[in-house]
């Protein structure tokens, strides 16, 4: 039975990843910040672990709990949009977005990626097309854009570090999805996005290590 790790599974894309992988017979390890969310994930059949991605001690504790695991696929989903205005960001707003979207990845990927080496597994982060510099046509959401561009950089560093060990690391844009962040007017349901993301990750080959991909598997400019 293959094993998948989903970091940030309390709702939205992460929660649907748990549901779909379990439906396909995978063993699922999933994290959430609140115990109530962990209890719900456990009811779906996942091994649920509490994790606050903004807390270094919590991340270190996760590493201990995952010791000796061999994982076939891992998804880093946890993220926040931050302020909807494009004015002067406060220090608190900056820290919330950058700590959640960037610093967490810098701390988590070195813990998670080695667990994929034995299986020559695949590690994916949920980024956003808004983080693309080459395709940027609007300055809206500047703090979120900056955080996702930085996340993509962290992903490439992981690809360079762990690719030689057989791990394939990729960054995905999930599409405009009907989640709390995307809103009800988004073009994709959570089910549609996750179905495509899973299929695209399954199709990724090691030669694509370090790629930035759309949910349908097509490349996105950095």
Predicted segments with their positions:
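N-terminal Rossmann NAD(P)H-binding glycine-rich loop of SDR-like oxidoreductase domains
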Residues: 10-22
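Rossmann-fold cofactor-recognition segment
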Residues: 43-57
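Conserved glycine-rich Rossmann-like NAD(P)H-binding loop of the short-chain dehydrogenase/reductase
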Residues: 24-39
